[in-house]
């Protein structure tokens, strides 16, 4: 089974958690694209979706799924999204696709976070994947200096503007042994919109695509 086939297995397995008549929180990325395709197969059974990115919104609309504004929804039953890394405590690094802030917002209004990944995303310690930080453009240099003080090696993601009009710093060489503490520290830097650590709001369910099919941990 290829890596993409494992992603597909995880994406389709997440349909188990979609309630009839519900509005579904939808993340961003290659694994989520498989979930969106799966959602299209039951589009008449759901009310619609709240999307975390322009890219996911376009894909949902192409499949005929109604997309609601986040401000028009009080609470979602589930949010389905991928991760760049996930540890045993279900804390994650996300934001490789630059949608981290909107992903955090949709996760915050969801009762259950279902994380869909392939087996390559599981790690013992977070930080091998560069940690994305969304930053107000005028604060980029200042935030980079502050991230160096925290032991990181930040790199400006050239040519990338987020859906919110901001920039991304990718922080390399971090051994993140206390994700919640680091999430708080980075979010406390002036000019940071949010950091791609999902530690305070980790995953409730992890669906991993494996060569044998989807493995579900609740």
Swiss-Prot record:
Question: For binding substrate, which residues are annotated in this chain's numbering?
Answer: 28-31, 81-84, 94-97, 121
Q: Which GO terms describe its cellular component?
A: cytosol
The protein's annotated catalytic reaction(s) are: aldehydo-D-ribose 5-phosphate = D-ribulose 5-phosphate
What broad class of enzyme is this?
Answer: isomerase
Q: Which GO terms describe its molecular function?
A: ribose-5-phosphate isomerase activity
Isomerase as UniProt keyword = yes
Q: Which residues form a coiled coil?
A: none
Q: Which UniProt keywords apply?
A: Isomerase
Enumerate the active-site residues: 103
The question of whether Lyase is a record keyword is answered with no
Q: Which domain of life is it from?
A: Bacteria
**According to its UniProt record, in which pathway does this protein act?**
Carbohydrate degradation; pentose phosphate pathway; D-ribose 5-phosphate from D-ribulose 5-phosphate (non-oxidative stage): step 1/1
Q: Please name the GO terms of the biological process aspect recorded for this protein, alphabetically.
A: D-ribose metabolic process; pentose-phosphate shunt, non-oxidative branch
Q: Which InterPro entries match?
A: NagB/RpiA_transferase-like, Ribose5P_isomerase_typA_subgr, Ribose5P_isomerase_type_A
One matching Pfam family is: Rib_5-P_isom_A
User: What EC number(s) would the UniProt record show?
Assistant: 5.3.1.6
Which protein family is it in? Belongs to the ribose 5-phosphate isomerase family.
What does the record note on quaternary structure? Answer: Homodimer.
Q: What does this protein do?
A: Catalyzes the reversible conversion of ribose-5-phosphate to ribulose 5-phosphate.
What PANTHER family does the entry give?
Answer: RIBOSE-5-PHOSPHATE ISOMERASE
Query: Which protein is depicted?
Result: Ribose-5-phosphate isomerase A
Gene transcribed to yield this protein? rpiA
């Amino acid at each position: 089974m290829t890596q993409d086939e494992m992603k597909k297995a995880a994406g389709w397995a997440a349909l188990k958690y979609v309630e009839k008549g519900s509005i579904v929180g939808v993340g961003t990325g290659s694994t989520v694209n498989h979930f969106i395709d799966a959602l299209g197969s039951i589009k008449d059974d759901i009310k619609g979706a709240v999307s975390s990115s322009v890219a996911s919104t376009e894909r949902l609309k192409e499949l005929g799924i109604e997309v609601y504004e986040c401000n028009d929804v009080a609470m979602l039953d589930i949010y389905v999204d991928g991760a760049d890394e996930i540890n045993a405590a279900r804390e994650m690094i996300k934001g490789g696709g630059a949608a981290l802030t909107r992903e955090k917002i949709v996760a915050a209004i969801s009762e259950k976070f279902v994380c869909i990944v392939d087996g390559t995303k599981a790690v013992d310690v977070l930080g091998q994947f560069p940690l994305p930080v969304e930053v107000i453009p005028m604060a980029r240099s200042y935030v980079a200096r502050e991230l160096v003080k925290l032991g990181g090696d930040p790199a400006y993601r050239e040519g990338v503007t987020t859906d919110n009009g901001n920039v991304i710093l990718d922080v390399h060489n971090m051994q993140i042994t206390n994700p919640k503490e680091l999430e708080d520290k980075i979010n406390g830097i002036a000019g940071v919109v949010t950091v791609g650590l999902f530690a305070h709001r980790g995953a409730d369910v992890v669906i991993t695509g494996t060569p044998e099919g989807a493995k579900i941990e609740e």
